[in-house]
Amino acid sequence: MADGSRLPESATSTTMETNTNEHAKVLSPDAETVPSSSMTATSSELSLDGRWGERDQGEPVSRRGAMEDFEEMRRELTQLSLRRTRSVGKDAHRLRSRASGRASQVHDEEKAIDEEDSTIDGDGDGYQGGFDLGEFLMGGHLERRTTTGEPAKKVGVLFKHLTVKGVETGASFVRTLPDAVVGTFGPDLYRIVCSFIPQLRFGKQPPVRELLHDFTGLVREGEMMLVLGRPGAGCSTFLKTIANDRGAFAGVEGEVRYGGLSAEEQLKHFRGEVNYNPEDDQHFPSLTVWQTLKFSLINKTKKHDKNSIPIIIDALLKMFGITHTKNTLVGNEYVRGVSGGERKRVSIAETLATKSSVVCWDNSTRGLDASTALDYAKSLRIMTDVSKRTTFVTLYQAGESIYELMDKVLVIDSGRMLYQGPANKAREYFVNLGFHCPEKSTTADFLTSICDPNARQFQPGREASTPKTPEELEAVFRNSETYKTICDEVASYEKKLQDTDQEDTRRFQKTVAQSKSRTVSKKSSYTVSFARQVLACVQREFWLLWGDKTSLYTKYFIIISNALIVSSLFYGESLDTSGAFSRGGALFFSILFLGWLQLTELMPAVTGRGIVARHKEYAFYRPSAVSIARVVMDFPAIFCMVVPFTIIMYFMTGLDVTASKFFIYFLFVYTTTFSITSLYRMFAALSPTIDDAVRFSGIALNILVIFVGYVIPKQGLIDGSIWFGWLFYVNPIAYSYEAVLTNEFSDRIMDCAPSQLVPQGPGVDPRYQGCALPGSELGRRGVSGSRYLEESFQFTRSHLWRNFGVVIAFTVLYLIVTVLAAEFLSFVGGGGGALVFKRSKRAKKLATQTTQGNDEEKVQDVGDKAALSRGEAMSASNGESFKRISSSDRIFTWSNVEYTVPYGNGTRKLLNGVNGYAKPGVMIALMGASGAGKTTLLNTLAQRQKMGVVTGDFLVDGRPLGADFQRGTGFCEQMDLHDNTSTIREALEFSALLRQDRNVSKQEKLDYVDQIIDLLELNDIQDAIIGSLNVEQKKRVTIGVELAAKPSLLLFLDEPTSGLDSQAAFSIVRFLKKLSLAGQAILCTIHQPSSMLIQQFDMILALNPGGNTFYFGPVGHDGGDVIKYFADRGVVCPPSKNVAEFILETAAKATTTKDGKKIDWNEEWRNSEQNQRVLDEIQQIREERSKIPVTETGSPYEFAASTMTQTLLLTKRIFRQYWRDPSYYYGKLFVSVIIGIFNGFTFWMLGNSIANMQDRMFSIFLIIMIPPVVLNSIVPKFYINRALWEAREYPSRIYGWFAFCTANIVCEIPMAIVSSLIYWLLWYYPVGFPTDSSTAGYVFLMSMLFFLFMSSWGQWICAFAPSFTVISNVLPFFFVMCNLFNGIVRPYRDYPVFWKYWMYYVNPVTWWLRGVISSIFPTVQIDCSPSETTHFNPPPGQTCANYAGNFITNIAKNGYLLNPDASADCQYCPYSNGAEYMATLNVHDGDKWRCFGIFLAFVIINWLLVYFFIYTVRVRGWSFGMGYLFGGMGLVIDKVKGVFKRKSEKA
C-alpha cells in the first residue's frame, strides 16, 4: 500500500470513501495479483489468501466474496420482506414515501460500501424495486441501513481529556494456610462484604494512580484503530474504557461520547451497542457453530423477523469461510471441536450477530500463526466495512499486511499517548523525531519498540535530542501538527453533530428502539422480552445437554447401575415387621441419591459465568434468565432421570404395589431431586469458585442428611439437639422423607416376624405374645404401619400434601436467591494483578519500593525493571557466564524419522522421512503451517512420544542414545508448565539439584543457579511466585529451569514466543542466540517470526502437513540461502517480503511453473542437491564422531539424583505447595470442623436407651459423610501434580515414579493427623463416649487411619483414571458401595446371598465401623424407656418372670424384664448392654484390634495401589484392557445408534 494512499481523517465527505476504496485494493483478489515471470500464483497473492484452521477445509477470507455473500443474504431477505409486504402494503407504501423524502434531504458522506455493493450486483434497479426492506431494516437488522441505503446506525467514538485511575495494590505476599485460618474469623468476611458495600470500609483508603493520562481523539464509524503498546502500557485499559466496562477502575475522568450519546446514557439504555471482546474465545464447547450463532441472533431479533435468522447465519458462515463447520462443535482445549482459527471466526461472527455499533478487540491473534492472524484482521476489516462499525484493535505481533488494513493507530506507553493519527503516517512521524527504523522491521514492531528503552534505536547524532521518556514523547506529540489535526477533527465532529441537530444520533436511537420487541421498554438495553430471553436460554440448555452426550449417557448409566445395585441389596425384603427399618433405609436412599448425583450441576453453573457475563454486556439476556432457564430445563431432564430410577427401586425393593402410592413416591423423588438441585445452584451462585461451591454444597447436603429424621427421629432432634434441632424444620429432605415413609406404611398392617415375637419357645401361648416393634399393641400380632411411624418417627400421613407444598416452597426460595445472586453478584474478575512474593527479607525490601496499578494487563514495574537486556552491548562478565553454560561438543543426528499413530480403523503417518542434525553453537528454527508436525517432531526427537510407532535412527556422535539422553537435553514446553506456588529461585534450584550430575556438589549447583538468575536478569523478582508472573517472565523462567539443568547436548523449545509482544519475543530469541554463540545447540519451533527474528537463527527446518520436509538448510544473510533455493525453482521472494512468511505460504499453496507443471515441494526437496548434502553431512558426522573414544562426562543413570534426594526435595516442594495454596489444607480442616461440630453437638451427651444406642451407631457411621467432600479436593490436587509430572518433569527425568508417589503420600499424612484430631475432639467427647484412655485412644487411631484412608483412596483412583470425567463417574459408585454395604443401613443378617459373603467383607468401611463400635459399645449398660419395650401379658396366675424367664435365659439370651414380678403388661427390653446390641450388627466384643489390623491393611493397600497404578499405567502404559472394553462399548453404541438412525430416516 502506498504511503500516500490514505489521508488523515477530516470532516470532509471524501475521506471515508478514499479509505474504503483503499481497503478494497488491499483485500480484493484482483488487487492482490502481481504478475510473475515464472509463476502463475505469486507469493504476494498467496500472502493475502490464507485460510483459518485446517488447510484442507476452510475457505479463503476474501472481502469481495464476503460482500457477494452479504448481497445474496440481502436478496433472500428481500424475498422475505416482499412476502411480508403483500400483507401490509399500505404501511410499506408510507414507509417508502418517508424514506424517499429523507433520501432527497440527507447527504451521506459514507457511501463507499454501497457503491461497491451496486458494482458487485450490477443491477441498480434490483434494490430500488425489489429490495423493499422498509420495516425490516428500520428494525435494526444486520446491515442496519435505511431504505435509501445509508447506514441506519452510525456511531463514531469521541473521547476528550480521558483519564483513568486505578488502585495501587503494591507487591503482595503469598497467602498461606495460617492467613486463611485467621481470615476465617473476620478479615475475609469483612473484605467480601466491603467488595459489595464499599461504604463500610474504614481507615486509610488505598492510593490511586493514573492508568491513562488525558487522551483525546476520534474514531469515526467505518474506521479501524490499532492500539499499540507493550503489555502493561494501558492498551486493555483504553479498550475497556471505550467499551464502557469501567468496574475495575477507581475512577474515569473526562468525556467519552458515542455519537451524541454520553457514556452514562449508553450504559443505561444501549449497553449492547458497544462491546469488548477479550483475547480468549469463550464459548460453550458442546454447542455447534450454528447453535452458537442462532442463539446470538434469537436474542437480537424481534419475533416478527425471526424467519430472517437462518438466512443471516448462512451469510455469516459464508462471509467468514466456515460453512463446513456449521454442525461442528465449537469445542475448547478439552472438548474437540473446530480449530483455533475457526473458533476466532466464530467469535467475530457472534459479535457481528450482536448488531453492535462499536467493538473493541483485545489481542485476539494470540497463539495464531502469521497467515491465520492476517485472515483474522481481514475478517475484522470485512466486519467494519459491511456493517459500518467502529472498531478498536490491540495486537501484540502485527505484520505489515495487518497494519496496512488499519485506518488509525494509537501508541501508548505508561498510560501516555505517544501518537494518534493516520496509520500510514506514524512511521514517518517517529523517524522525524530522531528514531531509527531498522530496514526489516515492520511498522507495528517499530512503533512498539519506541516504548522499550532497550529496543529502540536512534539516528546517528540525534541520540541526545530525541525525546525518550513517555512524558517527553507525550509533550512532543501534543505540540505536533498531528495532534492539532486530531483536535480539529474532534471539534469538527462535534460541530457536525450540532449542525445536524444530532440527526445520526437520533436515527441511531430510533433504529435501536424499533429493533426491540413491542413488549420491551424502549429504554431497555435488551432487544427481546424477558420471556423470550428465558425461552432462548431454555433452548440453549437443551442443546448443551444433548451436545454433551458422553456425560448424559454416563449419568444414566450411573443411575441405572446404582439403582440395580442398591435395590438388589433390599431385594426380597420381607413384608412383615422384620423389614420395616430396612424399608425405611431404601426409601431414604431413594429420595437422596439423585440429589446427590446432581452435584455435577455445580461445574456448568460456575464455569459458564464468563460467558454469561459477556452475553450480559452484549445485551443478549439478563443473567437471571439463565437461572430460570436451567430450572425449566430441569423439569424434563430430572423427569427422565427419575423414571428409570424409581421403577427399578420401587419394584425391586418390594414396596407397596399400589398405583397411587407409586405415583406419590415418584412425585416426591422428583420434587426432592428438583429441590436439592436448586439448592446446589444457589450455592453456586453465591460462591466465588468451584471449590467453594463444592465444599458448601457437600457440607450442606451432609447436614440435611443428619437432620432428616432417619438418623435421629424427629422428636429426638427437636428435644435432644438443643443447638441444631431447628434445622429439621428448614430441611426439605425431611418433609420428603416423612411423605414417602407415610405413603408406604399407611394402611398397611404388618405381621409380626417370628423373630420379633416375645416371648418365644415351648409352652408359649400365641395369645400372650407381644411384638418387638414400636407401635405394636398389647395382645395383637399385627402392627399398624401408621402407628409404627407415629411411635418411631412421629410421622403422620395427614402431612403428606402439606409436605409437598413445603418442598415446593423451599425450591422456590432457593430459586429466588439464585436469581437475585445471578442478577446482582458477579465473581468474574477483570484480570491483571500484582506480583506476589514469598515472605523473605529480600522480598519485603523490594515490596516497600514497588507499587502496582490495577491495570487490566499484568502491569508489573518490577518485571519491567528486571526485563531481559535488549541492547546490543553485553558485559564481559555476562559473556563469560554464557560461555560456561554449555561445554559439550557432541552432535545429535536423526535420519529417516517416521512417526505413525492409530487413526480410525487404520493408521496415520505424522512424520515422513525427516532428516537433520543439531551441532553445538547452531540455532535451528523448526517452522511449518498449522498441523505440519512441528511439535510432533520436537517431541519425537526428544524421545517423548508415548503412543504410536517411531522409526528412524537417533544418534549422538554416531552412537545410539544412552539412558541419560533425556536428562542431557532441555525441553521448554509451550504452555510454561510449572508448580505455580514455587518462587523463581525455588524452581531453578529444584531443577539444578535434581538434574545436574550427582557428582557435582550442592554448592556448585546453587552457585550455577545464581549465574542463570543473573543471565536472565531475574534478580529483583527471584522470590516472586511463578503463578503471579506475566507471560514474558514465565517464558524466561521456563528457559531458566532448563538451563539450570545444564543440558549437555541440546535445548528444545516449543513456541517460546507465543503470546508475547514483538519486543518480548525478540528479547527471548536474542537471548537464545547468545546461548547458541556460547556453544549451546538449540532447536526451536516458531510460528510468527518477523524478519528480524528469523535472522537470529542459523538454520531452518521447514515441514509441510504430513510431516514432510521441504527445506533444511542455512538461513543466510537476510534469508539469502532460503530465497535462492526457491528462486532456483522459479519462485521469487519480493524484496519487502518476510522470508519466513514467504516460504510457508509458497509451500502451502499449489504452485506451477511456466509450462503448467505443478510443483510438489516435498518431492522437490527429496530430489534436491541440498537434501543430498544434508544426508552426506549426517553420514560424515556418524563416521567421524563414532571413531572418537567415549569419555565419561557424567553418570550413566537415568536420573541424575538418587531416589532419596528426589523424594526429599519433592516432598519439600509439595508441602510448600499445600502451604501456599491454603484452599486445599483449609478445605480439609473446614470439613473436619463443620462435620465434627454437627455430629458431636447433634448427638450431645447421649443416654443409655435403645434410641441412644442407635444414635451412637449413627454418630459413628456419619464419618462416611466426609469422603465425598474431601475426595473432591484430593483428586484435583493429585491430578494437577500428576499432569505436571507426566507432561514435563518425568520426560525430563527430573524425578521418577517412586519419588512422585512417596512424596504425595507423605504430604497427606500430617494434615490427615491434624484434621482427624480436630474431628475426633469435636465429635468424640461431646457425644459422651467412654473417656478412658484405651477406648478414646483407640477411636482416635481409627479416626486417623480413616483420614489416611480417604487421601490414599482418592490418590489411587486418580492414578488409574485417565480423566476427570472417568473419576467423577467412578466416585459415586465407590461411595454407594462403601456407604450401604457395611451392615448399618441394612443389617448383615438380611443381606441377599449374592452380596452377603463377599461385598460386606471387602468393604473397608465395614471394618472401621466394626472396630469403633466394638470399642465403644460393650461398656454401655442399656436402660430401656417404656416406649422402647415389648409389651405382653402373661397367662393368668403367672408373673412376667415365670412366663418369659426361659425365653430370656435360653432363647433370646439378651435383654431383661423391667417388671419381672408383675402379672400384667410385662415390659421386655431386648438388650441389657451394648455388647448384646452390637451383636445384631454382626459386631462382637474383642473384634477391635482385629478390625484395626484389617483396616490398616486397607490403608497400606491403597498406598501400594498408588505405586502400582502410577508405575503400570503412567510409566509402562498398561490399560488393563480398558481400551478394548471402551472400544467395544463404543462399537456397540454406534451400531445401536445406526439402527435407530436408519429407522428414523425410513420414517
UniProtKB/Swiss-Prot annotation:
Residues 10-19 have a biased composition (Polar residues). ATP binds at residues 928-935. Residues 51-66 have a biased composition (Basic and acidic residues). Pfam families: ABC2_membrane (PF01061), ABC_tran (PF00005), ABC_trans_N (PF14510), PDR_CDR (PF06422). InterPro entries: AAA+_ATPase, ABC2_TM, ABC_trans_N, ABC_transporter-like_ATP-bd, ABC_transporter-like_CS, ABCG_PDR_1, ABCG_PDR_2, P-loop_NTPase. Signal peptide: none annotated. It is a multi-pass membrane protein. SMART domains: AAA. This is ABC multidrug transporter atrF. It comes from Aspergillus fumigatus (strain ATCC MYA-4609 / CBS 101355 / FGSC A1100 / Af293).
